[in-house]
Every structure is written in C-alpha cells, then in structure tokens.
C-alpha cells in the first residue's frame, strides 16, 4: 500500500511540474546595440539602427567607441513608457515592457544623425506620433530609414 501511495505522489508531482513548465512564459531575449564612431551606415551610428523586440526583452546599448550614450527622443516613446538616458561611456541595459516605437539618440551626436529605433511588439500604436516628431535633418533621414527597415 505504501508503494501505491508513493507512486501516486510521484505521479502527481510529475504532472504538477509538467503543468508548470507548459504554463511558464517564454524566456525573454537579450539584444545588443553598439554605439560606433563609424559603421556600415557611416559615421556616428547605432548598430543595428533598427531593432524589433518582444515586450519583456532586454537591450544593452554598448558604447563600443568612447564618447557615446543613449537617450530616448522626446515625443518618440509610447504612452506609459519611461524615458531614459545613460551616462557617457557606460553600457546601459533597458527592459522594454510597453509596446510601441522608441526613438533613441546619442546626446552629443544627435545633430550628426546618431539615432536608432526599437520597436516593441508588432503593432506600434504610437507610430504616427513618432513619424511626426521633429528632428535634425540627418537624424530624421536615419530615423526614416530605420523605420522603413522595420516595415513601417
């Protein structure tokens, strides 16, 4: 009788573990964006310049070359999302939870077009606001290209 009860407990425990594994959410992904003096798209760039992630994913912005930071661009983040700004020359990790499009810039090199786009999720509700934001000419050209690369 003890073996039957023990087997029942083991079997119930196994079922509980299996149920928890099935119910567990997929692990969030980690991405890297490098801040470079020179990249495939020219001088002062984020590589990649556009990135699509899922809510809960993390992006680490890495100043591969010195003198860079990352900061959200005013008017280019989803409602409810928090703006962020890193220090110069420091890696900066962001976990994106609010779906939408985030425009980012390197503060010292914004006028030179050092910008990028992170899209969180598939249907960015703030896309029109992002497209309507005013930016320096070179920055706007690169933002338009980054949005186009994401299919927007």
From Swiss-Prot:
Cofactor(s), by name: Cu cation
Signal sequence, start to end: 1-28
Keywords: Copper, Electron transport, Metal-binding, Periplasm, Signal, Transport
UniProt: Cu cation binding residues: 68, 106, 109, 114
UniProt-annotated location(s): Periplasm
Occurrences of domain Plastocyanin-like (ranges): 33-121
UniProt-recorded Gene Ontology molecular function terms: copper ion binding; electron transfer activity
Record note on cofactor: Binds 1 copper ion per subunit.
Principal place of residence: periplasm
UniProt protein name: Pseudoazurin
Organism: Achromobacter cycloclastes
């Amino acid at each position: 009788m003890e073996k039957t009860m023990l087997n029942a407990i083991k079997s119930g425990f196994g079922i509980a573990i299996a149920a928890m594994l099935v119910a567990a959410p997929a692990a969030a992904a980690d991405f890297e964006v490098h801040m470079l003096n020179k990249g495939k798209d020219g001088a002062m760039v984020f590589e990649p310049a556009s990135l699509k992630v899922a809510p809960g994913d993390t992006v680490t912005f890495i100043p591969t070359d010195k003198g860079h930071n990352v900061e959200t661009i005013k008017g280019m983040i989803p409602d409810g999302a928090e703006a962020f700004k890193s220090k110069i020359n420091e890696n900066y990790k962001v976990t994106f939870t609010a779906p939408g499009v985030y425009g980012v810039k390197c503060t010292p090199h914004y006028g030179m077009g050092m910008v990028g786009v992170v899209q969180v999720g598939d249907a960015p509700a703030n896309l029109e606001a992002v497209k309507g934001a005013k930016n320096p000419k070179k920055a706007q050209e690169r933002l338009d290209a980054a949005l186009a690369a994401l299919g927007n």
